Structure formats: C-alpha cells, structure tokens
Amino acid sequence: MQKIRKGDKVVVLTGKDKGRTGEVIQVMPKEDRAVVRGVNVVKRHQRQTQNQEAGIITKEAPIHLSNIAIADPKDGKPTRVGFKIDGDKKVRVAKRSGDVIDG
C-alpha cells in the first residue's frame, strides 16, 4: 500500500514551491514521483499538431515523493503516514494527529 495516493492533499516541503498545498493528480511509483496540481509548474514549447496549435504551454512537472508530505486532516500541516489494521482493512493514519486518512 502506498503512503501517497492520487487525490491526496499534500504539502510541498522543499524547493521553489515550499509551503504550497495541492492535490495529487498522478503518482509514478517506479520513479518515486508525483504530479501535484498547481505545484512545480513549468513552461513547455509545444510544436503544432493536427489537434493542437503551437505555443508555450504551462503544465505541472513531477516532483519527488521525498519533497512532499500528506496534509494532516485536522490542521492541514504536513504529517508522516503510518498504517493501522482497522477490523480487516489496512488504513493509513496521520502520525501527527492519529486521524485516519482514508475516506
């Protein structure tokens, strides 16, 4: 089970977007990276294709998982993630507050 999943609210810990929060759009476990909405935005030059015109587009670039942390459900501050067996299900738990992260 992954500690950071698609749809999680995360806080950026280091880099040019330090302190920003966003939602995880995509997780790439093999590369240990994630794409977060509104974070690590880069400009790319786009060549013209049949269905897209040329120009400079902005998009989110992947950020390393070590540079982001899940936002605590209680106060929104960064927290580490632990696991707990709840009945017969394994759930993610915020180490900071003890709240269950999984909906």
Curated annotation (Swiss-Prot):
The keyword RNA-binding applies. SUPFAM superfamilies: Translation proteins SH3-like domain. GO terms for biological process: translation. SMART domains: KOW (SM00739). GO terms for molecular function: rRNA binding; structural constituent of ribosome. NCBIfam families: rplX_bact (TIGR01079). One of two assembly initiator proteins, it binds directly to the 5'-end of the 23S rRNA, where it nucleates assembly of the 50S subunit. Part of the 50S ribosomal subunit. This is Large ribosomal subunit protein uL24. It comes from Sinorhizobium medicae (strain WSM419) (Ensifer medicae).
